[in-house]
Structures are given as C-alpha cells and as structure tokens.
Amino acid sequence: MAAAGAYSASLPAVPDWLNKGDNAWQLTASTLVGIQSMPGLVVLYGSIVKKKWAVNSAFMALYAYASSLLVWVLVGFRMAFGDQLLPFWGKAGVALTQSYLVGRATLPATAHGAIPRTEPFYPEATLVLFQFEFAAITLVLLAGSVLGRMNIKAWMAFTPLWLLLSYTVGAFSLWGGGFLYRWGVIDYSGGYVIHLSSGIAGFTAAYWVGPRLKSDRERFSPNNILLMIAGGGLLWMGWAGFNGGAPYAANIAASVAVLNTNVCAATSLLMWTCLDVIFFRKPSVIGAVQGMMTGLVCITPGAGLVQTWAAVVMGIFAGSVPWFTMMILHKKSALLMKVDDTLAVFHTHAVAGLLGGILTGLLATPELFSLESTVPGLRGAFYGGGIKQIGKQLGGAAFVIAWNLVVTTAILLGIGLFIPLRMPDEQLMIGDDAAHGEEAYALWGDGEKFDATRHDLSRGGGGGDRDGPAGERLSALGARGVTIQL
C-alpha cells in the first residue's frame, strides 16, 4: 500500500497543478464507461441472443475490450490525440513511459493550432485511460451487428486494424484538434465519433460477413430477458461517466450533461414503449431497452450544450425516428432487409447518433458552449447559428460515414483473403459448442453437438440411472452440469 507520503504536498505525487477532485471524477467517469462495456454490454449481448450464441456473443465483446487496451497504449492514443500528422490523423507513438504519463495532461483539441492550449488538473495517464474506454466501447457496439455468424478468428484480426485505421481518424478529426473540430462541427461526447461510426461500420461489416442462418434470422429470441435488462441498466447508469466525463473536469457542464442524459433516455424509452403499445397493442421489454439506447445515443452529441427542456425534445425524437426506421422503413427497404444487422446497431446508433448531431446543431446554446468550448462563436441554429451550423453537422457526418464505409470494407476484404469472415454453416447450426467448445447453460437441445437419440439414453421414468453407464457416457462426451433433454 502507498505510504502516508502520498498525502504530502511536498512530494512529486501531489504537484501544485493536481486537483484531486477533478482527477477523482475523471477516474470515476473512466470506470463508469468501462462498466458499460464490461460487464454491461457483455451481459447484454450474452442474454439478448439465442442460447446457442450466448458465449460467442459475450466473448466477442470481451475480446474487443481487452485487445483495444494494448493497441491504444502502444500507438492508438497518440494517433487520435497526439501531434498532428494530417488534418484528420495524429502521429503514432507509445503512451507507456513514465515521462509521458505522469506529466500534466493537455486537452487534445488544444494541443496544436491557433486554439489556446488548455491543461486539465490531472496527469496524462488519466486522460489515456478515459479515452481508451471510449475507443473500446465503439468496437464492442460494432460487434452487435455481426453476432451469430462472424468467424471469431476474423474478429480477432479485425479489432486492432479497425481501431487504428478508422476510430483514430474520427477521434482526431472531431476531438483531437483536427479539421472537423476547427471547422466547428459539434460532437460533445461521441454521437459521431462513437455511435455514428459503430453503426455505419457495423452495418458495412454485416454486409461483407453475410447473414446468419435463415432459422436464426427468423427466430432469434433472447435467452434471458432479465439479464438483458440488467445489462441495459449498467449501460444507462454508466452513461453518467460517458457524458459527465466529457468536460474533462468536475464542473457545471458535467452536472448539466449527466442530468440531460438521464432525462433524454427516460423520455425516449417512454416514447418507444408508447409507440409499441399503439401499433402492436402491447409493450415490449426489448423495445424499451432499444428506446433507452436511442435516447442515450441521441443526447450524446449535445449532452452538456442543450437546455434540459431540449433534452426532452431530443428524447421524443430519439424514441420515434429510430423506431420508424426500424419498424417501418426497414421492412420497405431492400438493402436494409438484405443486410443482417443482428442487433439493429444501424438504427440504434447510426440513426440515433446522426439525429442527435442534427438536433444539437439546432438546440445548442451559446451560454452552455461558453462553459467548456474553446472554439468561439459556436451555437445552434435556433440561437443564431443559422443554417450554417446544420451544414457543418451534416458535413461532419458525411465524412464519418464515408470514412467508416470505405475503411471497414477494405479491412474486411483484406482479412477475407486469409481468414473466412463467416463461420461455415455446419458450425452455425451448432453455435457456441462449435466456436468455443463451451455452452452458456448445460441444457441440451439448442445448438449442441450431442444427439441423445443416438446414444441409447432413457428419456425419464424409472429406467434411467444418472450414476450408471449413461451418466458415464455423458461425462465422456464432455457434458457439463445437470442436463435436461429437450
């Protein structure tokens, strides 16, 4: 444990510029965003899919989270937030050395160019950790589009390449002082960098990987709705760090952002549920979680920049526009019907993220901008920004969409030359047991290799002996736990 000297102002661990409150909040916000991915989305993915894909889906999220960290500290962070190499990209470099990590951080967007340099009251290590959590969750969200059929080895190759070649470009352009930031495109906490990127890249990946089996597309019911709600709840609560950490300080802007985040999420959930009741005569728990998600995504581009009444307005749109694209437009579009986006990431993240960016361009107030932005004159169209700000929001979105579409395609086509992107149909029929040799629950009947009818087992009554030869054969075949023949 640390010695009492950690509390001494005369020691290097407590430099004059360190604000313990800001540092503590930023580390807390980092942890909250981390909890969104692991266990939040790990639990959500493992429960919202069919039982035979629970392990594979959870592992894809877990692997993306872990692999992102090493790539991030080796080269990714400085490509996204380091010195400028190109107007949309930073210079690669490690973020592993003491000399780099213990010094005072610099807000990435003010590190170069004509914008005054701003230094928060904590070390660079805190900033590296905070921004890692955003990079990781973007890949975890992207995974939702290709669950239930992507070759896990192809996914393992895809995650580092996409992080380096796609995510870092959006992050530098909008947050690292790149050309979109200097132009005045508003993205408070990741509506474009994270959600629009993951939605477009996920949809593109789903196209190239190919669809699930027909039987899985037709019937893909969640294996545990209660766990799905728990995972969604972790995601919602973690969003306090997601948007509350964006000002890089424990200040007024953080308070406004956290309140607006919760207001928009609740409004969107209620709006989505009402539409389900009106059109389908009953509320859907899955729909409620989707409505919660679209509300959280929609408020993200402007969480600390809009008034709370505007967060209600954004929640109404967040619960209705993605609902319409998913429930109505999707069924009328040949392209949307063809591409098998497993968890509808395109609708819940790309559509909601773009919607949030446009609404922020309308509703952002100059007074709230002045609390945290170093770019002068930014304001929504309703506050004097005019159509010009909407044009900037649409232009920024167009760049993010085009870059993710092209780069994701190139990465997957390159990987496909060496590793099949999709599992063979034989493995898709089986699921987790074929992909990992493991199952979420010890229940026979949904995707396992073992066929009880081929092994002379009693199906109940008094003739079966679990401790006899049948039980021994089950053990030899690798069955784990109590089995139920379905």
UniProtKB/Swiss-Prot annotation:
Swiss-Prot/TrEMBL induction comment: Not induced by ammonium supply in roots.
Q: Where is this region: Disordered?
A: 454-473
Membrane spanning segments where? 29-49, 57-77, 127-147, 161-181, 190-210, 225-245, 252-272, 285-305, 309-329, 343-363, 399-419
Task: Report, as the record phrases it, the tissue specificity of this protein.
Answer: Expressed in roots and leaf blades and sheaths.
* Single biological process term from Gene Ontology: ammonium transmembrane transport
**Pfam families found in the cross-reference section:** Ammonium_transp (PF00909)
Gene3D superfamilies, sorted: Ammonium transporter AmtB like domains (1.10.3430.10)
Q: Where in the cell is it found?
A: Cell membrane
GO molecular function terms noted in the UniProt entry:
ammonium channel activity
Q: Which InterPro entries match?
A: Ammonium/urea_transptr (IPR029020), Ammonium_transpt (IPR001905), Ammonium_transpt_CS (IPR018047), NH4_transpt_AmtB-like_dom (IPR024041), RhesusRHD (IPR002229)
Task: Output compositional bias ranges, type Basic and acidic residues.
Answer: 454-470
Principal place of residence: membrane
Instruction: Report how it sits in the membrane.
Output: Multi-pass membrane protein
Record keywords, A-Z: Ammonia transport, Cell membrane, Membrane, Transmembrane, Transmembrane helix, Transport
- GO CC annotation terms, alphabetical: plasma membrane
Question: Matching NCBIfam families, A to Z?
Answer: amt
Q: What does this protein do?
A: Involved in ammonium transport.
The UniProt family comment states: Belongs to the ammonia transporter channel (TC 1.A.11.2) family.
The name of this protein is Ammonium transporter 2 member 1
Q: Which organism is it from?
A: Oryza sativa subsp. japonica
